[in-house]
């Protein structure tokens, strides 16, 4: 990808071949420092990127890197001092930037990828917005998993009732409110049909939290610290949307960030990869910047949601989240994916699939509207991935170039 701060804070993805001015190096504090031996290039890149006004990426194979047995190119664990130096370089970087962190550690089982635990200065309330229509077993699984597993200290759940018919649904609402009187409420949207954007915009009016979490009713929490992992990024002024790693019930990837332009609009990176997979160059293991996140589980500060005008209600079902993330980026914020917040997503159970002519017509209309609105950006490509990948695929397959 192009320069992405969170990627660099997770691993030295820039690696070796870099050109910069002597003036920039002097301004950044001079050449490589041998006290960071083994990760001296990483430490230098962190200092240079703190100072540089513009960083350019050339997306072409300009050189080949040798790999010999016992070298860090083949296995960094062969030289553990490199890992220690990388952690020290990151801690020094955060100190210079005035960023408070609780810990920096090697992600277990990875060849030099780092996890930063940012200090959560103020654990502000998270308002969890869940649109729902019948399918009460899915909702019960979702809500019960939140209360049973979540360790974050301050959250509220706002169930956005959307034209349910089953009496059991309303009995369940009453029971849930009785069990959680302090932080669960039900609000009723009076519109007809299904409009995910309108439902969330309506629910947001009742939110008392500093943060909004858009969450599908067909999800289930896996990791207890999921909200801490998301809030530690959403609290940062530079960050807009934060997305989680979502798994299908068969433990394959449903969402690990959205690639912009895939299939003509957008697609889920690493979709259907095994949950245990490292992904392309380890990208399923570490926090990284992405163009967009799915709104099936998306955290954002409420002030940013209001700043960009919420979800666009002309996108009733598809691409409302991608359109929202594009507008958040246009407002100057960075969107992030973290693999350390994990949930199951039993996708589209309550709404159904695009399986009839009416739904297909609506879907095509949303595709055309999105392409008309963001055509220039789609043509420019996704800086969070690489133009050498096949834009029709979500699995990081290389583009096949025609023979000249």
What are the roles of these predicted feature ranges?
Residues 19, 79-126, 250, 262-289, ...:
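C-terminal, non-catalytic tails of nucleotide-sugar-dependent glycosyltransferases
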Residues 4-91, 300, 310-315:
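Conserved nucleotide-sugar donor-binding catalytic segment
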Residues 1, 219-265:
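Conserved donor NDP-sugar-binding/catalytic core segment of glycosyltransferases
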Residues 212:
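Short aromatic/hydrophobic "clamp" motif used to bind/position activated sugar donors
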Residues 36, 46-65, 88-107, 116, ...:
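Catalytic donor-sugar/metal-binding loop of nucleotide-sugar-dependent glycosyltransferases
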Residues 144-154:
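Short, acidic, metal-binding catalytic loop of nucleotide-sugar glycosyltransferases
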Residues 1-23, 35-37, 195-198, 261-303, ...:
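A recurrent flexible, glycine/aromatic-enriched loop bordering the glycosyltransferase active site
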Residues 189-207:
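Glycine-rich, basic loop-to-helix element that forms the pyrophosphate-binding segment
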